[in-house]
C-alpha cells in the first residue's frame, strides 16, 4: 500500500469503504445473514446494526449453537478444518442453520469454496497440496 502513489491509495481506500460488514438476504423462502467472522457478544435481542466491526469480522462463531431458528448464518474466517465437530474438514460445514464456507485454502489439502444459496450446490477449487 505504501508503495502506491496517492491517487492509487485513495482508490484502494474508496474501494474498501464500500464494503458491507454484513448482508441480509432472502433467497426464495430462506433468510440469510452473511458475515465474515461471527457474531461476537451474541444475544437474541441484539440487532445486527449493534454489532461492532470486531464482532462481525474477527469473532469466531460457536458451531454448536443455533443463532437463529429462521435465518441461516453464513460465515468465513474460521477454516472448516478447525471446527472440532466437523466430520468433513476442508468442505463447507452446515449445521444448526449455520453455513461455514472457509475451507482452509491456506492449509495443505485446503481449497476455496462457494455455495449457491438458490440451490445449495457447492463449488470447490482444486486441493492446495502445500
Spans of model-derived segments:
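Acidic two-metal-ion nuclease catalytic site recognized across multiple nuclease folds
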Residues: 130
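Hydrophobic/aromatic beta-strand elements that line small-molecule binding cavities or substrate pockets
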Residues: 113
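Acidic, His/Gly-enriched loop-helix segments that form or flank divalent-metal centers
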Residues: 1-100, 104-110, 123-126
Amino acid at each position: 500500500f505504501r508503495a502506491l502513489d496517492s491517487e492509487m491509495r485513495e482508490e484502494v481506500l474508496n474501494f474498501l469503504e464500500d464494503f458491507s460488514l454484513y448482508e441480509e438476504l432472502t433467497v426464495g423462502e430462506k433468510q440469510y445473514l452473511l458475515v465474515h467472522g461471527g457474531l461476537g457478544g451474541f444475544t437474541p435481542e441484539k440487532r445486527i446494526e449493534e454489532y461492532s466491526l470486531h464482532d462481525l469480522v474477527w469473532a469466531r462463531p460457536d458451531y454448536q449453537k443455533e443463532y437463529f431458528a429462521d435465518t441461516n448464518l453464513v460465515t468465513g474466517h474460521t477454516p472448516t478444518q478447525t471446527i472440532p465437530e466437523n466430520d468433513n474438514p476442508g468442505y463447507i460445514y452446515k449445521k444448526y442453520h449455520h453455513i461455514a464456507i472457509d475451507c482452509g485454502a491456506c492449509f495443505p489439502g485446503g481449497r476455496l469454496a462457494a455455495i449457491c444459496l438458490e440451490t445449495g450446490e457447492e463449488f470447490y477449487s482444486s486441493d492446495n497440496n502445500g
